[in-house]
């Protein structure tokens, strides 16, 4: 090898070694920085959890020797957990105290977890239980204590999801002990093998957390979990043994129970006719107080709460979104306790207790449901001091109003001895949880438009409220089961919303009154009266009924007036459809003088039209002069060109008010006018339907908007019958505009409620009749074809 080659090889070798040293040093520095960051996070986390009884301590087997710095254990109250190989010592010493051996569990690779109890403590190994946790789609928040290379363990917060423990700030390299927080206690969940990414459950004589599907006991419990039914004439409540919460609230139809005011609508009939599982009630395997299984029936009820899709077990509503659940965690979607046992059960009440004895719940229907329709009470008892705990409302089912859903959240507060109702801005997908502090709601409403869930605290609670966005795929609506191939009601279009109220951190019992039913004047009035008599204060539940819309502040008085008149006509005729027609007649008679005056003014405008054209032709090069001459002509002949628009402008508030009324009045929901065609005044009429959806039209043919367009077209023809002489360009433009308006209104009203179409169609027909009659009268008596021009009369 010559010198040049030797030099080249040497330089290459030096460069390679230099690169290795450089990159190795950078990697070493990076690892060192990461270790320092992890240690800092661990110290902060450990400082936070030490306040609630979890700490890391060294231990030794010799009472006279110093505690070994490389032996570490996790202390939780009067229990000590430590990892060991081989046989466990019968006693150890830690924190200057003696600890006695209780039991141990083999994890993996000859790694054992031993359990010790503090000498003289009240810990009873036979008094144990299990806390069953759901497989949360967002991941369960856990506390991880990682043992690494005989060093002081790292403590950090992580998430358990699909068998893996993850943390954004730290990668798990060693063996870890995983805990789940239940209230103010940390309950061991398992031993985590980072190499196999496997969580081994701990079969130790202590209260422990169990993931459904990861433990034989939990799987067995899940399969045999029951539901229990409470019922009266107004509601059917389904209580879940797994969550200890309410999985379903079903309201009977008026057709099956004369005390109910809930009518069956098209969606209910469609699901029942298809014998869909979504139309089964109670729908879930449920027990009755006599121990018998509740029999499912097809239809007969309206499901107030979303149940997911009963036809697909994978699409059932997750346990954390059940109503009256007690939750905590970062997203307020982690139940504080799961898996309950029933302590007592009657047709009208049930008492449950969580297996870890941290939560007790009582659900009770009223003794006199006629005085408290659609109401029940719940009492939630927390046996331990627990921070950041909330109670949930559940997720209401979807109601369609004018081809869209209308979820609403409101709460009532007392300000300066006066009650006020405030509307809550709905949370969005990017920020699903919205929490507001510093307010004390008297009650909070979670509504789908026609129905609502009102939570009223009967005992003192913490300040604030929360609202939670839940994706439609997580909480699918029953409507998605209607024509799923055509995707008429895709789950992505209908997210759910949940309201939450905070509980005090102290142990104690917290009581709530729950209204779960229609936002209807009759029932809310009765409830207001009953509560006022009991408490001496009116809760004003009736305020939860409000008229919606951008112009509600203008149209609300009109809507209230229309509803009063409609109720009178309903009392006389017994039909809401006829009452809408009579309301239209009443308004036409009321506004007749103004409409007649407007028609007379329009007739004069038609007579002046040729003279206006002459002026425009004469002064075509002097537009200002032409405008002055035309205005003078109007003034001389006592004509106001704006008066022709007045009837439409005056009717507009009534039209919008009627639209708001149909979206707000529960009594009109499901009200039939012509069976088989107009079955629901708050939904479009359906003359016939088909399977395949067509753009804009959908899969239903609505006749009323077509009739409306025809009547508007005829109205233009009636108006043009009295125009004499050649048709001017302006008149041609008016005819074209009139025809376009007829087409526009047909398209605009196509998916509007049938009640609104009946109102506007009746108004248009009466308008045509009125115009024809008025024209006849004007032709014979009131209007001469005379025009004053230059102080001279012309014919």
UniProtKB/Swiss-Prot annotation:
Main location: membrane
Covalent lipid sites (N-palmitoyl cysteine): 19
Signal peptide bounds: 1-18
Transmembrane domains' residue ranges: 450-470, 549-569, 571-591, 642-662, 694-714, 741-761
Membrane topology (UniProt): Multi-pass membrane protein
GO BP annotations listed: protein insertion into membrane; protein transport
InterPro entries per UniProt: Membr_insert_YidC, YidC/ALB3/OXA1/COX18, YidC/Oxa/ALB_C, YidC_ALB_C
Pfam families linked: 60KD_IMP (PF02096)
Subcellular location: Cell inner membrane
Lipidated residues (S-diacylglycerol cysteine): 19
Stored PROSITE patterns: PROKAR_LIPOPROTEIN
Molecular function per GO: membrane insertase activity
Keyword tags: Cell inner membrane, Cell membrane, Chaperone, Lipoprotein, Membrane, Palmitate, Protein transport, Signal, Transmembrane, Transmembrane helix, Transport
CC annotations in GO: plasma membrane
Family the entry assigns: Belongs to the OXA1/ALB3/YidC family. Type 1 subfamily.
Family annotation (NCBIfam families): PRK01001.1 (NF002168), yidC_oxa1_cterm (TIGR03592)
Function: Required for the insertion and/or proper folding and/or complex formation of integral membrane proteins into the membrane. Involved in integration of membrane proteins that insert both dependently and independently of the Sec translocase complex, as well as at least some lipoproteins. Aids folding of multispanning membrane proteins.
Subunit organization: Interacts with the Sec translocase complex via SecD. Specifically interacts with transmembrane segments of nascent integral membrane proteins during membrane integration.
Protein name, entry field: Membrane protein insertase YidC
Species of provenance: Chlamydia pneumoniae (Chlamydophila pneumoniae)
Taxonomic placement: Bacteria, Pseudomonadati, Chlamydiota, Chlamydiia, Chlamydiales
């Amino acid at each position: 090898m010559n010198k040049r080659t030797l030099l080249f090889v040497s330089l290459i070798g030096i460069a390679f070694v230099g690169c290795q040293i450089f990159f190795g040093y950078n990697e070493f520095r990076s690892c060192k920085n990461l270790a320092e960051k992890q240690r800092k996070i661990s110290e902060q986390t450990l400082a936070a959890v030490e306040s609630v009884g979890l700490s890391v301590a060294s231990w030794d087997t010799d009472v006279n020797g110093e505690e070994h710095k490389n032996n570490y254990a996790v202390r939780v109250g009067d229990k000590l957990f430590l990892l060991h190989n081989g046989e466990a010592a019968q006693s150890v010493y830690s924190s200057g105290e003696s600890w006695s051996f209780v039991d141990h569990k083999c994890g993996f690779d000859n790694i054992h977890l031993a359990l010790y109890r503090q000498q003289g403590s009240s810990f009873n190994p036979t008094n144990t239980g299990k806390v069953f946790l759901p497989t949360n789609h967002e991941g369960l928040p856990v506390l991880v204590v990682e043992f690494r290379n005989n060093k002081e363990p790292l403590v950090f917060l992580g998430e358990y999801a699909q068998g893996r423990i993850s943390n954004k700030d730290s990668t798990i390299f060693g063996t870890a002990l995983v805990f789940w927080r239940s209230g103010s206690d940390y309950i061991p969940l398992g031993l985590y093998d980072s190499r196999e990414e496997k969580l081994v459950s701990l079969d130790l004589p202590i209260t422990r957390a169990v993931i459904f599907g990861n433990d034989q006991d939990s799987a067995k419990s899940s399969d045999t979990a029951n539901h229990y039914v409470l019922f009266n004439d107004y509601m059917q409540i389904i209580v879940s043994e797994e969550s200890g919460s309410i999985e379903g609230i079903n309201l009977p139809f008026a057709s099956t129970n004369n005390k109910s005011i809930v009518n069956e609508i098209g969606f209910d009939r469609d699901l029942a006719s298809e014998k869909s599982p979504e139309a089964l009630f109670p729908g879930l395997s449920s027990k009755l107080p006599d121990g018998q299984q509740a029999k499912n029936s097809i239809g007969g009820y309206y499901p107030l709460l979303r149940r997911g899709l009963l036809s697909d077990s994978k699409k059932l509503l997750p346990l954390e979104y059940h109503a009256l659940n007690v939750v905590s965690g970062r997203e307020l979607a982690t139940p504080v306790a799961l898996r309950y046992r029933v302590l007592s059960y009657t047709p009208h009440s049930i008492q449950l207790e969580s297996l870890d004895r941290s939560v007790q719940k009582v659900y009770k229907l009223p003794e006199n449901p006629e005085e408290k329709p659609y109401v029940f009470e719940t009492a939630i008892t927390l046996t331990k001091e627990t921070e950041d705990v909330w109670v949930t409302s559940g997720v209401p089912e979807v109601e369609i109003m004018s081809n869209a859903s209308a979820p609403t959240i409101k709460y009532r507060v007392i300000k300066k001895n006066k009650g006020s109702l405030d509307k809550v801005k709905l949370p969005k997908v990017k920020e699903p949880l919205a929490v507001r502090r510093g307010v004390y709601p008297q009650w909070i409403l979670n509504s789908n438009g026609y129905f609502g869930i009102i939570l009223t605290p009967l005992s003192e609670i913490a300040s604030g409220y929360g609202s939670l966005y839940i994706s439609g795929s997580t909480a699918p609506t029953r409507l998605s089961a209607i024509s799923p191939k055509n995707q008429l009601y895709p789950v992505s279009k209908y997210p759910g919303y949940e309201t939450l109220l905070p509980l005090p951190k102290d142990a104690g019992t917290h009581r709530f009154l729950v209204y779960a039913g229609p936002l209807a004047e009759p029932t809310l009035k009765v409830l207001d009266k009953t509560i006022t008599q009991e408490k001496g204060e009116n809760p004003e539940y009736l305020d939860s009924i409000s008229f919606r819309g951008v112009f509600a502040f203008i149209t609300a008085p009109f809507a209230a007036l229309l509803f009063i008149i409609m109720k009178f006509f309903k009392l006389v005729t017994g039909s809401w459809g006829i009452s809408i027609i009579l309301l239209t007649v009443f308004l036409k008679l009321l506004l007749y003088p103004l409409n007649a005056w407007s028609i007379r003014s329009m007739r004069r405008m038609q007579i002046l039209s040729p003279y206006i054209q002459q002026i425009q032709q004469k002064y075509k090069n002097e537009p200002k002069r032409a405008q002055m001459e035309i205005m003078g002509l109007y003034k001389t002949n006592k004509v106001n060109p704006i008066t022709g628009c007045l009837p439409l402008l005056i009717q507009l508030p009534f039209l919008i008010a009627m639209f708001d009324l149909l979206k707000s009045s529960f009594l009109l929901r499901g009200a039939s006018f012509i069976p088989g065609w107009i079955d629901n005044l708050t939904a479009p009429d359906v003359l016939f339907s088909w399977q395949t959806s067509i753009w804009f039209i959908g899969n239903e043919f609505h006749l009323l908007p077509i009739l409306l367009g025809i009547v508007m077209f005829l109205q233009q023809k009636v108006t043009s019958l009295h125009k004499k002489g050649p048709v001017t360009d302006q008149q041609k433009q008016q005819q074209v505009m009139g025809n376009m308006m007829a087409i526009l209104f047909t398209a605009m009203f196509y998916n509007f409620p049938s009640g609104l179409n009946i109102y506007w169609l009746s108004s248009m027909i009466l308008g045509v009749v009125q115009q024809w009659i008025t024209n006849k009268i004007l032709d014979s008596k009131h209007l001469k074809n005379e025009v004053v021009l230059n102080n001279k009369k012309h014919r």
